A protein has these predicted regions:
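C-terminal interaction surface of TIR/SEFIR-family domains
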Residues: 1-26, 41, 45, 89-135
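An anion/phosphate-binding loop that grips the pyrophosphate of nucleotide cofactors and donors
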Residues: 54
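Hydrophobic acceptor-binding patch used for acceptor engagement in glycosyltransferases
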Residues: 57-58
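Conserved TIR/SEFIR loop-to-helix hotspot centered on a Trp-containing motif
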Residues: 63-83
Length: 135
């Protein structure tokens, strides 16, 4: 079981790999498709299983993730299973999925203080553990 499922666009892979490394260094167990989906498996079914098994859903906001049909499916599956949503702004984007607008975002853009905001993300992952345990 993972602490957090990471939803992102493949075009943002360098940032997501760095973020995954930072989360792992902070004793978190992030789920990412490049390391958690075996070859020849039904990749979408594995993604859905990863979402269902995770405590939280981290959506990396960028123009590419916002435009991604797969990311939209992941968000909808997350909502269907009442998972905790954590929007993380990596790049400014328009037309963000409606459900993300109801949540307070974390900002890990290049202009932001990455280390300070990473600590906010870690705190957010640790907050409201009763809710996380229920779902």
């Amino acid at each position: 079981m993972s602490d957090v499922f990471i939803s992102y666009s493949r075009l943002d892979i360098d940032f997501v790999r760095y973020l995954l490394d930072q989360l792992t260094a902070h004793d978190r167990e992030p789920w990412a498709d490049w390391q958690d989906i075996l070859p020849t498996t039904d990749w979408l079914a594995e993604i859905y299983t990863g979402i269902e098994a995770a405590d939280s859903f981290l959506f990396i906001i960028s123009p590419d993730s916002v435009a991604s049909e797969i990311c939209s499916l992941e968000i909808e599956h997350t909502v269907k299973h009442n998972k905790r949503l954590i929007p993380v702004a990596w790049k400014d984007a328009d037309n963000v999925h409606q459900v993300m607008l109801a949540h307070n975002w974390l900002f890990l853009r290049e202009a932001d203080d990455f280390n300070a905001n990473l600590e906010l993300l870690i705190d957010a992952l640790d907050t409201d553990l009763d809710y996380v345990r229920i779902y």
